[in-house]
Amino acid sequence: MGVPKFYRWISERYPCLSEVVKEHQIPEFDNLYLDMNGIIHQCSHPNDDDVHFRISDDKIFTDIFHYLEVLFRIIKPRKVFFMAVDGVAPRAKMNQQRGRRFRSAKEAEDKIKKAIEKGETLPTEARFDSNCITPGTEFMARLHEHLKYFVNMKISTDKSWQGVTIYFSGHETPGEGEHKIMEFIRSEKAKPDHDPNTRHCLYGLDADLIMLGLTSHEAHFSLLREEVRFGGKKTQRVCAPEETTFHLLHLSLMREYIDYEFSALKEKITFKYDIEKIIDDWILMGFLVGNDFIPHLPHLHINHDALPLLYGTYIAILPELGGYINESGHLNLPRFERYLVKLSDFDREHFSEVFVDLKWFESKVGNKYLNEAAGAAAEEAKNCKEKRKPKGQENSLSWAALDKSEGEGVASRDNFEDETEDDDLFETEFRQYKRTYYMTKMGVDVVSDEFLANQAACYVQAIQWILHYYYHGVQSWSWYYPYHYAPFLSDIRSISTLKIHFELGKPFKPFEQLLAVLPSASKNLLPTCYQHLMTSEDSPIIEYYPPDFKTDLNGKQQEWEAVVLIPFIDETRLLEAMETCNHSLKKEERKRNQHSECLMCWYDRDTEFTYSSPWPEKFPAIERCCTRYKMISLDAWRVDINKNKITRVDQKALYFCGFPTLKHIKHKFFLKKSGVQVFQQSSRGENLMLEISVNAEPDELRIENIASAVLGKAVFVNWPHLEEARVVAVSDGETKFYIEEPPGTQKVYLGKTAPPSKVIQLTDKEQSNWTKEIQGISEQYLRRKGIIINETSAVVYAQLLTGRKYQISQNGEVRLEKQWSKQILPFVYQTIVKDIRAFDSRFSNIKTLDDLFPPRTMVFMLGTPYYGCTGEVQDSGDLITEGRIRVVFSIPCEPNLDALIQNQHKYSIKYNPGYVLAGRLGVSGYLVSRFTGSIFIGRGSRRNPHGDHKANVGLNLKFNKKNEEVPGYTKKVGNEWMYSSAAEQLLAEYIERAPELFSYIAKNSQEDVFYEDDIWPGENENGAEKVQEIITWLKGHPVSTLSRSSCDLHILDAAIVEKIEEEVEKCKQRKSNKKVRVTVKPHLMYRPLEQQHGVIPDRDAEFRLFDRVVNVRESFSVPVGLRGTVIGIKGASREADVLFEVLFDEEFPGGLTIRCSPGRGYRLPTSALVNLSHGSRCETGNQKLTAIVKPQPSVSHCSAAPSGHLGGLNHSPQSPFLPTQVPTKGDDEFCNIWQSLQGAGKTQHLQPTVQEKGAVLPQEISQVTEGHKSGFTDHSVRHQQRKHDSQRKFKEEYKSPKAECQSQKLSSKQTSGGSARCSIKLLKRNESPGTSEAQKVVTSYPNAVHKPPSGIENFLASLNLSKENEAQLPHHGEPPDEADLSPQSFAMKGTRMLKEILKIDSPDTRDSKNDMKKSDNEATVSSRRDERGVSAHPKPTCHMNKPHGTNEFQNVASVDSVCWPGQMPPVSTPVTELSRICSLVGMPQPDFSFLRTTQTMTVCQVKLSNGLLVHGPQCHSESEAKERAALFALQQLGSLGVSFPLPPPIFTNYPPAVPPGAVPPVFTQPTANIMPSSSHLFGSVSWRPPVPVAGNAFHYPSYPGTMPLAGGVPGGVHSQFIPLQVTKKRVANRKNFENKEAQSSQATPLQTNKPGSSEATKMTPQESPPASSSSSQAAQPVSSHVETASQGHVGSQPRSAPSSSKRKSRKLAVNFSVSKPSE
C-alpha cells in the first residue's frame, strides 16, 4: 500500500511532477517494469462495493492479458520488459498484509449481510475473494501458467515483443514485486558495461515507488500509474485500460524539486552539498510518517503538514551534524539521534496545545484527568522541586539584587516560582500523557526505562531494516516490528551506540504465508488439511484467527487507514502446528508449496515448437512457438551490501526527449500557498512555485528579431514538459510575421536559411484575441503547473510534432522525416526553448524502396481505385527502377449503409427540453433542472445546522462544469439541456417517492443548500432517515452505474449501431472477396511501421459518422486490416487527441462494448485509421448521405468565423452534425446558370421533406468547419489551398485525378435540342489553368453588367435541354467563384422570363402513371451558395423566378403549387403541420396528452407554450385523436393569427432598393429533436426558425391550407441531410420531347391554396412514387428577390393535364454515383 496520501501531497507541492500520458508523445524507454499485483486486483475485483458482482477466471485472465498488451504498447520498451508478481513477502510485510486481509474479509461479510437484510437476492455462484491474490493459492497457480502462455504467445506472434528480453518473476519467486524489480536494477547497475543513460519506466500504484525509484539514483526514471481522482463522488473503477487515464511521474523533475526544497543548505553547510546525499536523507525522512513496515510516529500525519516539519527540522539541524544521515542505506546513528532530538520539540509543541485546552476545560468544569495526573505524579513533582530549590533560590536572590526595592524583589520571586511550578506541571503532565499512550495503546502496566529503551531500539532497528530493504534488498526474512504503534520522538534516545545486526534467515513457504496472513473466512484458499487450524477450538493457534477484532484510527481519518488490532503470528508455533498436517498434502499441493526461479524469455526464429494451452477450451495452443527461455536463480541478482553503485548524473549531457528538466529556462522558485489545482480540487498546502525570469535585452524581444530567430525553425514548447514544434508565425500584438509557403509544405529551415515570410498589422479584433490567448496561457501555467510566466512580449504560433513518416525521393531514396500537425497553437515566447542538443535515438535501417516494401509485406492503398484495401507486396524487382511496386489487393464486400443513414432518425433516442418534461410531470422546469443535477441537503436546520456534512440527493444526470452528460438520459445541445423519456420516468419515480422534497424545493428555489429538518419538520418525521432512504435508492438504481460522456462526443445511438451490425452481417453472407494485381507508385501505399505511429496515413481524409474505416496499426489491440464503422467522434483541444469510436465487423480479444455487441468496439486516433468512405467519395465525387462531423475541440482557439455569422442548420440532440455556414453574397450567378442548364426540362419531384432541410454538407465543408468551429486552422482559404494541393498530388498518379473529377462533376450530360443534338461543356469564367483554388475563392470578377451578350450566350439562353439528357448535379465541394452579375446571367434571366411569360419549355408536365409525380412546391434556385461549398439543386429555367418558400433555414414549400385534376397529392398530417409551424415561428413543440372517456373513447389535448389549450373530439384510437386535436389547434392558430404566411412577390426578378441588414439567428444554439418523426410522410421538423438573410426574399411558411400538398412518399425514405439525386436507368426516346413539354406545360392548371383548405385525396399504391426517389430541391437557399409586404397571393392560369398516352414511361432509380458520359 505504500505511504497513504503521500502521492497526492507530493504532486500538489511539486505541481509539474506528473503529466497525462499521450500515446503519440510518450518518451522512449529502454526498460519497462510492471508491479503486477495492481493489475491483477484491477482486473479481478474492480468494484468491491457491488455484492452482486461475479467474474469468471477466464475473463480475469483475458483482461490481465489485455492490460499488459496496452501497457506494453503505450511504453514500447526497447530492451527489457520485466513482469513481477508478489511472491512470499518478508515477515515485516506480512503483519501489514495480515491486517489488510482480515479487514477486507470482514467488510465483504458485512456488505453481504446488509444486502440480505434489504431483501436482495444474491447470485448463487461464489463471489471472487480478493484474498486469493496471495502466493500459493490455486488461483495464483492458474494465473502463473496463463501468464507464461501469454508471454510465449506474444513473443511468437507480435513483432514488437520480439526484440525485447522478457523477465517473468511469478508468485513462486520470493519477494515483493517492486523489490524484485529493484534487485534487477541494482544488479544491472553493478555490471561494468551499464549505460548510465538507460531509461526506466516503472508501473505501479504504490506511492512508495517514488522512493524506490529515487534510491536507484538513475537520471531517466519515470513512474506510470492510473489517474487518481480525489474528492467528489466515488466512481466505479474502470477495467478497460483504454478507458483509463494514465499519468507519468518524472523522477527527473522530482530530483530537481528536492534540490530546490533544500537549496537553503547550500549556504549553511560547511561540507560539500551533494544532491544525491540529500535525496537519500529525503527518503529516510519519508519513512518517519509510516509505511508498510512500521507505524507512523505519534501525531505525525501527512495531511497535518508532517513532511514540511521534517524538512524544516532537517534544514535547521544538518549544518550542525557535519555530514548526512543516510549513507547509501546505512544509518549514521549519532546524526540520526541529534535529528530526532531536534524533531522531538514537536512532541512538546503538540502536547502544549492539548495541555492549554485541558487547563481551560478544567477551569470551566474541573477535569478528572488533570487532577489524577497531578496526584499520580505528586511525589515525582515534589522530588523535582527539591532538586531545583537551591538553584531557584539562587536565581531569586540574584533577581532580588537586581531590583531596587524589596517589594519588587518579592514579586519577582513569586512570579518565578509560579513559572517554575507551571513548567514542572507541564513536564509532569507530558510524562503522564505519554505514559497513558503506552498503557492504553500497547497494553503495558508499567512504563519503565527499560520499556522505553526497548521501544527506541526496536524503532531504530526498523528504520535500518527498511533502509537496507530499499537500498540492498532483504537483510532478514524473519525480522518484523513487534508493535502496532510507534514510540514518541522524545523517547527515542541513547541510540548512537546501538549495535544493529540482522539474521538473513529464509522466506516462508507459500502455504506458511497463507496460514500466517489469511483470516478464517478465507480458509477455502488453503489446502483442506490446514483449514481446521483456523476454525477448530482445539487448534494450537486458534487465537491468531479472531472472528471479531477492533480497529483504531489512531489519528487517521479513513477507516482503511486504521490499525487492525489482531495478534502477531508466532512463527515457531505456526510451523509446529503445520508440521502435523504436511503429510496430508496432495502431489499438486506440494508442487504449489515451493519456490521457483525467475523466467527469462526471448525470441529465436530458429526455435519452433507447439506450446500447449493451459485452458484449451478458452485459449488456443501456440502452433509455432519461437520462444527460448532460461531460469534465473533466486540469488542471481543479489548485490553485495557494500557495492551499491550510485549513478552520477551528467548535468551537461544531451537532453533526452520526454524526460523533462527545469534547467532550460532561467527562473526563480519559492514556496507559497497558491491553490494550484493538480487534481480535482485546489491544493490547500504550499506549492513550490516557479517564476520565469526575463533578462533579455530589449533588442532581443523586438518582434523582427524574434521572427528571424524562430520563424520556420524547430523549437521546444510547453516547458517543462517539452514538445518539439515548428514555428509558423510570431506576433507582438500589433504586428504578425508568418511563413508564406505553398499549401501542404511543412519545411524546417535549418541554419541561417530564412523562410519566405510576410508581415501584417493586426486588426483590433486580432489584437483582442492575442491578449486573450496570453491570458489563457498564463492562467493554465499558474493554475495547473505553478509557474508564473510574467509579462509576455510575443506569442509564437507553432505546429506540434506528430511523428515521423517515410518519404520517398524522386531517385527512390527513403528518408524518415518529421511530420507536423496541421493545427496551429499559440505559445508565449518566454516558455519556448531553442538551440538545445536533444538525443534522438530514432534511427532507421530503411534506405531504399526494397527495404520499405519487401515481398510479402502488408500495405494499404491510399489511391483510387481500391482505396483502403489491404494488399501484399509481390516481387517487384523489375519495376523498382521505374518507381512502381507490384501489389495484390483484396477487395472485400462492403455493407450498404445508405438506407440506414436516410432513416437514422427512426432509431434515435428522442430528447425533449426541460419544460416539456415539466409539463408532463406537473412540476416546474426549475425542479427538472435541479433534480437532474445535484442537490445538497445538510443535517439539522438552516437555523441550527449539525456539522458541515451534506448529502447529494440529485440524480446526477448532467454536469455543467465538467461538460458531461449521461447518454440515454440527458443531452446538451448548445447551452440547453434535453431529456429523454428514460429521464422522465426516473423523475416520475422520484416524485412519487419524495413528493415533500419536491414541494419544499419548489417553494424555496432561491436557496443553494437545503436542510433535513426544514424539509421534514414534523415531530414524527425523521429527516436523516428520509435522506438516507433517498441516497440508498439512488445508489441502488441502475442509473447510478451509468457512465458519463463528454458533451463534445458525437455518437450514434445504440439502436442505430444495432442496425449497422445487421447490415454488416448481411454483407458477410455474400462473401465476396476478389483479388486484383496492380502496380502502384510507392507514395500511394501505407505500410504499418512502428516508426510511423502517430502519423495520419492520409491527411486529406475527413471523418464522419457512418464512415467505413480500416485499422492500419500493427501490434495493436485491434487486428491490423480489420474494418469497421465510425459510430462516435470525441473532440479534443488538440488534433492528435481526437478519438473515433469504431464498431468493427468482427469481435476481437480486447474489444470494448461501446453501445454494440461485446468485444466489437474500440476507440482509435486518426493515425490508426484509413477512411474507406473518404476514398469512395474521392473516387465517385458523390457525397454520402450524412453530414460532416469535424472533431470539436473542447476549447476553441480564436475562431475564424466571420462576424456576421447568422448560424446555420440545427439538428436534433442525437444528431452528430455541425451547422452549415452562412451563404455569402455574390456567388450565385454561376450556380444559377449551371442549375438552369441542369434543371431545364426536368420534372420537379415531390415536396422536399423537412429531413432534407438544406443540410447538404459536402466533404470540403469540414475545412471551413475546422477554422470556424474548432480553431484547428485560421482561414478557409488555407484549406482550399490544401485541397488544391491534394488535387495536384492526385493528378500525378495513374488514378483519377481530383481535378479531373471536379471537372466531371461540373460537366453536363449530352443534351439534345429538337432533332439536333449538341454537346455542351460549361467552363468557369475567367479561369486560367494556373489559378489555384484559393485564388478562385478570394477573386472577385469585375462588374461586366454593361457588356452586350455574345452569340454563345444567346445560344445557351435559347437552348432546349432534353429531359432524357438531364444530368445529375453531384455535390462538388469547391465553392464557386464570387462574381457580380455578368452578361451571361443577364441573357439567361431575360430568356427565362420570356419563356415563362410565353409558357415555353415549362417542365411542369406530367408523366404517365408510372412516372414520378411533381411536387406541389417548386423551390427556387439558390441565389447564394453556402460558403462551405453546398451546391444548389437543379431547377427548370422557366421556374427560376417563381415565389420562394424555401431557404437554408426553413425548408417549406412555396405558396405556388401545381395540382393535377383527378389526382390530388396526399395531405401532410395536422400533427406534422402543427409541429412544423411551432418550430418555424420559434415556439416549443406542442404537448399531446390523452384522456379516456367512460365509453372507452380517446380524447387528445394539445397544449402550446403560448397558453393555448385545445381539446379534440372523441375518437376510437389515440392516433386519430391526436390528428383531430392537432387539426383543431391549427384552426385555432389560424383564427388567432399566430402563423404569419406572407404572399409571394409580384416582381420576383428585382432586388429590393435597400437590401435589409443581416438579422441574427433567433436561436443562438441548436435545439433538440423534440418530436419523433412522422411515420407516413415526413421525418423530423426543421429546428431553426426562418431567419431573414440580407438581400434575400423572406416570408414565413404557411400552415395547412396555405401549405402545398406533399407527395406521398413513405416516411423515412429520404435522407435528412442530402437530397437523393434521381437519374434514369435507361435512356428514353428523345423524339419530339420539347414539343410534348411545351404542350404539357401549357395544359397544366394551377391552383392557389386558400388558407384553411385541407382537401386532398390519398394516392393509391400505383400512383405513389418509388420509395427510393426524392426531390432534388430540398436544400435550395432563398433567391435574392424583392417581396412586397402588400402583395397578395398570385395565382397562375390553369393548365390542362397532359395526355399520358403521348409519352413513353420512364423508370427512375436512385443513383449515388456520378453519371457516366455514356448515359
From Swiss-Prot:
One example of a Gene Ontology biological process annotation: telomere maintenance
Modified residues (Phosphoserine): S1382
Pfam families: SH3_12, XRN1_D1, XRN1_D2_D3, XRN_M, XRN_N
Keywords: Cytoplasm, DNA-binding, Exonuclease, Hydrolase, Nuclease, Phosphoprotein, RNA-binding
Listed InterPro entries: 5_3_exoribonuclease, 5_3_exoribonuclease_1, SH3_12, XRN1_D1, XRN1_D1_sf, XRN1_D2_D3, Xrn1_helical, Xrn1_N
Low complexity bias: start-end ranges: 1661-1680
Biased composition range(s): Polar residues: 1301-1314, 1638-1660, 1681-1690
Bias (Basic and acidic residues): 1268-1298, 1397-1430
Disordered: annotated span: 1268-1317, 1397-1445, 1634-1719
One term of GO molecular function: G-quadruplex DNA binding
E.C. number: 3.1.13.-
GO cellular component labels: cytoplasm; P-body
SUPFAM superfamilies from the UniProt entry: dsRNA-binding domain-like
Tissue expression as described in the entry: Expressed in heart, brain (spinal cord, dorsal root and superior cervical ganglia, neurons of the cerebrum and brain stem), peripheral nerve fibers in the skin and intestine, spleen, lung, liver, skeletal muscle, kidney and testis.
Class of this enzyme: hydrolase
Location relative to the cell: Cytoplasm
Subunit structure and binding partners: Found in a mRNP complex with UPF1, UPF2, UPF3B and XRN1. Associates with alpha and beta tubulins. Interacts with DIS3L2. Interacts with ZC3HAV1 in an RNA-dependent manner. Interacts with ZFP36L1. Interacts with TRIM71 (via NHL repeats) in an RNA-dependent manner. Interacts with YTHDC2 (via ANK repeats). Interacts with DHX34; the interaction is RNA-independent.
Assigned protein family: Belongs to the 5'-3' exonuclease family.
Function: Major 5'-3' exoribonuclease involved in mRNA decay. Required for the 5'-3'-processing of the G4 tetraplex-containing DNA and RNA substrates. The kinetic of hydrolysis is faster for G4 RNA tetraplex than for G4 DNA tetraplex and monomeric RNA tetraplex. Binds to RNA and DNA. Plays a role in replication-dependent histone mRNA degradation.
Protein name: 5'-3' exoribonuclease 1
